[in-house]
Amino acid sequence: IRLSLVGSEMCIRDRYNKVQEGPTYYSYIAFDLFGGELMTSTGRPIDLINSLSNALHTFVSSQWNGYYKALLQVNNVMSIAEGLADSPTRNRVLGECRYFRAYIYLCLVTRFGDVPVLRQNTQAKVSRDPASMAWELVEEDLDAASGFLNGLSADSFYYVSPAAVTALKARVKLYLGKK
């Protein structure tokens, strides 16, 4: 029953939705805003940057909260799936979860630098870990995702595939200056 739950179409769609929509549309334009590509009526990009860069501003807090809400769901599904017997469905679920966790941390670390690294969910207050720890987890999760998804094809063009994992690995290596 647990495997059918975490591998169900509804659960899969919800995971995809949380990762994409949780951080809100702000996360998609953040680099343009803080990179000086957009500006206010004053014609100076710095005015926009100064008004949006407050940690309490919805622009920042909605991204942070959205990514961590998605991460909590991914970690929860992963903890359930890890306790199940080995099967192609289990491996697909774990591969997708590891991919999503890597993607979430890639987004977090490139936007915020040092972030709390949560390998499993906790109720405890957590502090920020060095960005290097987040990058290590991203690389580790992508390697694990490759292993879990190896030999499996995506159910649809829109789902995580081994090629998607390879593409995200390439992006990570570019960020880290690795070959």
Where are these regions (language model features)?
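Post-signal-peptide N-terminal segment of Sec-exported extracytoplasmic proteins
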Residues: I12-G36
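Outer-membrane beta-barrel translocator domains and adjoining extracellular loop/strand segments
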Residues: R119-T122
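Short, surface-exposed glycine/acidic/tryptophan-bearing loops
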Residues: E37-G43, V115
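N-terminal propeptides
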Residues: W135-L137
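Conserved, well-structured interaction surfaces
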Residues: D14-K18, G43-F112, A124-M133, L142-D155
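Single conserved hydrophobic/aromatic residue that forms the stacking wall/gate
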Residues: I1-G7, I12
